[in-house]
Amino acid sequence: MKIAIGYHLQEGPWGGGNQFAQSLAAALRDHGHQVCFGLRERDIDLILLTEVRGRSPSASFHAGTVLRYLQFCNPRAVVVHRINECDERKGTRHMNRLLRRANYVADHSVFVGSWLRALPLWRRGAASVI
């Protein structure tokens, strides 16, 4: 299986998202999967959307890029949206809107906590809490 992780790996200390992406990529490769960090390849089986802020230096793609990929390259790719952020967590006023929009391209949502899943923001499609 070919899996695209929406994260630009960073060298050195960069935070939890970077550690998550590095660990996930290593585990997937150990299990025989191919891992890429962009949407240039036409035969991606699974897209992991990890960052909704398009201008973030850690984002290798965002929801708009995923939507274009599904429309013009590979409509069979499955999209999983990893959600670990919200306005309530940091007192911001923009993340919920970005997350809600991005969530529309997802076939499945993975929440890092049940408290995130309980917020009235998400499509009520397939979801998991880790």
Predicted feature residues:
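Active-site phosphate/pyrophosphate- and oxyanion-stabilizing loops and adjacent acidic/basic residues
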Residues: Q22, A26, R100, A118
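Extended catalytic core of nucleotide-activated donor transferases of GT-like folds
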Residues: C36, R40-V105, W115
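Short aromatic-enriched loop/helix-cap "lid" or pocket-rim segments at secondary-structure transitions
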Residues: G15-Q19, F61, T92-M95, R123
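N-terminal pre-catalytic "stem/leader" segment of glycosyltransferase-like enzymes
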Residues: M1-G54
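A short, active-site helix/loop in glycosyltransferases that binds the activated sugar's phosphate group
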Residues: Y104-V129
